[in-house]
A protein has these predicted regions:
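Soluble oligomerization/assembly scaffold segments of membrane-associated complexes
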Residues: 1-169
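Extended, helix-rich structural scaffolds rather than catalytic motifs
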Residues: 170-184
Length: 184
């Protein structure tokens, strides 16, 4: 039986990053998922000043708003979530979807746990003193590591990860500011 870890990565242009971010977050929640990361920022590309009078200057700022978002949704809702997110796309840079079958990794971890338990019971039967304690501790540590690895894989199977990089067209902000150099 296959057990897939499904992931999606998208980069696209939107009309308004802030509005699209809220839409993506709302869609994620409605699908039973959650946001694990978001980094909404504005990057200034140019600032210019134009004198409009002896005491006033027009400051023009050119900037780009972008956001990197990571969400997790139930595996069964990945396709629906991607379709709902796509309504925000003005231009798609790329979309990558991957599915990694981890059934053999889970089997290997389960077998490691069984071997460790069998080894511990054999050592307990022979009761070899202090060296047995070290061996049992080592075996238990291996079993614990395998169990934790399976839990992590199970979580990744149940919840797909979607990484989004969104941006919008460059924006302008104009502001009339005081020209302090000419004020006496």
């Amino acid at each position: 039986i296959h057990q897939f870890i499904r992931k999606a990565e998208l980069k696209f242009k939107v009309k308004n990053v802030v509005n699209s971010t809220y839409d993506i977050e709302t869609t994620t929640l409605k699908m039973g998922g959650f946001v694990t990361y978001t980094n909404l920022s504005s990057s200034i590309s140019k600032v210019s000043h134009t004198a409009v009078s002896s005491d006033s200057t027009l400051e023009t700022t050119e900037y780009v708003v972008s956001n990197s978002i990571t969400v997790r949704v139930p595996n069964t809702k990945l396709d629906t979530t991607l379709m709902l997110i796509s309504r925000n796309i003005e231009f798609l840079d790329y979309r990558i979807i991957s599915a990694d079958d981890v059934a053999l990794k889970i089997l290997a971890n389960t077998l490691t746990q069984k071997r460790a338990k069998m080894g511990m019971s054999r050592i307990n039967q022979n009761n070899n003193g202090n060296s047995a304690v070290d061996i049992i501790t080592n075996l238990q540590s291996r079993a614990d590591d395998a169990m934790i690895a399976n839990l992590a894989l199970s979580d990744q199977i149940q919840y797909s990860t979607i990484q989004l990089s969104i941006y919008q067209r460059e924006s302008l902000k104009r502001e009339l500011i005081a020209n302090n150099q000419n004020i006496k």
